[in-house]
């Protein structure tokens, strides 16, 4: 046993001293000193046990060994709290040393248990708890009399106070041990997660409490670059828990996330202290479904997910994605629908979007060219004189945004009519998509790009028709009331509203080829995820910032819309685990 104790003590000191290697900052120093102090206490307790051979010394030694791995991991966390990038080699060494500490602790506590005293410490006899006074076999009146008599005895009072204090300390000890046990479980085995949003409806509803299994995913040693080996290969359709890549990965953020996960699990997912700078709960971690695998390119068009592998010649639909993707929450059974808080797109709105998708798919670009040329010729006749200037710059980039453009349709129409260069601008705007799509060199264009070129042409045709109708009304000296109530104009504006509605939600139904490079594919050990509730899921398709984006990237004067599409894959090390069980509410309890 002496040699065994020396190995434990030496390991503890080595671990504590290594905390400051290549890591000289204040918290690392504090963690190292704390580890050395605890290691010294461990050595002192062992020496006292060997010298006194008393049961009290054994209990103290056993309790210190009980806390040994927990104190060491706390010292490690303290030493890494402000480290931007800790050296992998040192992190790996310390992690392996800690696992050694945990194993040695288990063996040591086993040796120090009461049932093993006779074998390892024959000179030490366990102290049995004595009853302060006995009431066994006494009648109620006699019991009361004995209690009252004993309470007048100062020695008895002291024994009672002593016993109460011991019991309190044991409760505190049990509470701390439970906290540390939960910490280890949360780091290496399970994580409790309470669903905060409806991105995975109908699989998960707001308030569902699920358990994620972390061990197969190779959990990371806290606040370090070291991970246990991953032996889980994710499949399409797996539901995973992952760190949100949209949040900055800073030492402060990592520490806050770590502490919040501990509090979250201790409070059974009732308290979340992981908030952003505005005090709002972070959407972190996320629960999403794996939809893209290593070696794949992805594309989402009209709500259909397509995949292409390196040896494929074309994109093919992912049939199984339709089993998970939900576009029409209103069609769910009433038992599920009543649990949903927000249904952004109902069945009728979905039909409108699908009608736009069918309309743009059916548009022949050659026919669109002819229609566009007809509109330009019609405007030339209406204006009645040829421009003598180049195309006037009527619009700034922001004014090409769909809603802004159509809101200003009457103003733009009047400027086209009255400005020298107005006709030239109209011709330039309406035909700017011609060069690329008439070049014959469009084979490299993706299905997404073709569909959005068709949508861009549809919107421009609609805008051109509105401009023509406005100028016709101007020429006819229509009154304001006639202008506002004109049926042809209002029908075109209604069509424009349909396109605007589609563009407002197109970020959820469409995504261009990802990864974008011709020879780029999702790399090894990386995955792509989306939520099942595609209209209400901010996932790996999206970023947090909306940017003004061209509907047709090959059109210099394209219609613009606000897009937050910026797809990203997630390295396997960012995946925390897979969901295995829904535990609450009990009405939805079940394996996943």
Per-segment meaning from a language model:
Residues 184-201, 250:
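Hydrophobic alpha-helical transmembrane segments in integral membrane proteins
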Residues 152-191:
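Internal/C-terminal transmembrane anchor helices
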């Amino acid at each position: 046993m002496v040699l065994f104790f020396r190995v434990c003590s030496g390991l503890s000191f080595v671990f504590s001293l290594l905390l400051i290697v290549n890591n000289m900052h204040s918290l690392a120093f504090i963690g190292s000193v704390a580890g050395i102090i605890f290691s010294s206490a461990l050595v002192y307790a062992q020496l006292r046990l060997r010298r006194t051979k008393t049961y009290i010394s054994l209990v103290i030694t056993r309790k210190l060994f009980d806390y040994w791995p927990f104190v060491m991991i706390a010292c490690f966390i303290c030493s890494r709290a402000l480290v931007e990038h800790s050296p992998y080699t040192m992190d790996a060494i310390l992690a392996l040393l800690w696992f050694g500490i945990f194993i040695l602790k288990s063996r040591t506590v086993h040796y120090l248990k009461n049932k093993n005293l006779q074998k390892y410490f024959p000179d030490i006899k366990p102290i049995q708890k004595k009853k302060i006074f006995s009431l066994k076999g006494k009648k109620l009146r006699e019991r009361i009399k004995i209690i009252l008599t004993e309470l007048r005895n100062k020695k008895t009072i002291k024994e009672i106070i002593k016993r109460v204090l011991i019991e309190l300390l044991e409760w505190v000890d049990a509470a701390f041990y439970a906290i540390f046990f939960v910490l280890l479980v949360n780091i290496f085995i399970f994580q409790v997660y309470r669903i905060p949003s409806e991105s995975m409806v109908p699989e998960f509803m707001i308030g569902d409490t699920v358990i994620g299994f972390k061990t197969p995913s190779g959990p990371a040693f806290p606040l370090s670059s070291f991970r246990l080996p991953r032996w889980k290969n994710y499949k399409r359709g797996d539901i995973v828990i992952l760190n949100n890549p949209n949040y900055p990965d800073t030492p402060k953020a990592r520490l806050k996330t770590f502490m919040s996960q501990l509090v979250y699990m201790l409070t059974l997912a009732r308290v979340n202290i992981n908030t952003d700078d505005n005090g709002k709960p972070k959407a972190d971690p996320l629960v999403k479904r794996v939809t893209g695998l290593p070696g794949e390119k992805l594309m989402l068009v009209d709500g259909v997910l397509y995949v292409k592998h390196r040896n494929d010649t074309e994109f093919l639909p992912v049939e199984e994605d339709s089993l998970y993707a939900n576009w029409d929450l209103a069609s769910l059974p009433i038992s599920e629908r009543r649990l949903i808080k927000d249904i952004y797109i109902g069945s009728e709105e979905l039909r409108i979007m699908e009608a736009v998708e069918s309309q743009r798919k059916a548009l022949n670009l050659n026919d669109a060219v002819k229609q566009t040329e007809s509109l330009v010729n019609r405007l030339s006749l209406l204006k009645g004189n040829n421009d003598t200037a180049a195309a006037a710059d009527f619009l700034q980039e922001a004014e090409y945004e769909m809603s802004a453009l159509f809101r200003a349709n009457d103003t733009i129409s009047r400027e086209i009519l009255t400005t020298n260069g107005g006709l030239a601008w109209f011709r330039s705007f309406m035909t700017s998509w011609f060069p690329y799509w008439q070049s014959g060199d469009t084979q490299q264009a993706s299905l997404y790009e073709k569909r959005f070129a068709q949508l861009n042409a549809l919107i421009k045709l609609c805008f051109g028709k509105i401009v023509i109708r406005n100028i016709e009304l101007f020429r006819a000296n229509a009154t304001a009331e006639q202008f506002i109530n004109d049926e042809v104009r209002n029908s075109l504006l209604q069509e424009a509203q349909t396109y605007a509605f589609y563009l407002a939600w197109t970020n959820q139904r469409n995504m261009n080829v990802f990864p974008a490079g011709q020879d780029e594919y999702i790399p090894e050990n990386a995955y792509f995820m989306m939520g099942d509730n595609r209209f209400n899921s901010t996932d790996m398709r999206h970023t947090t910032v909306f940017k003004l984006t061209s509907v047709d990237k090959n059109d210099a004067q394209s219609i613009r819309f606000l897009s937050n599409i910026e797809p990203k894959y997630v390295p396997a090390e960012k995946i925390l685990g897979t969901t295995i069980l829904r535990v609450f509410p009990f009405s939805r309890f079940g394996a996943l």
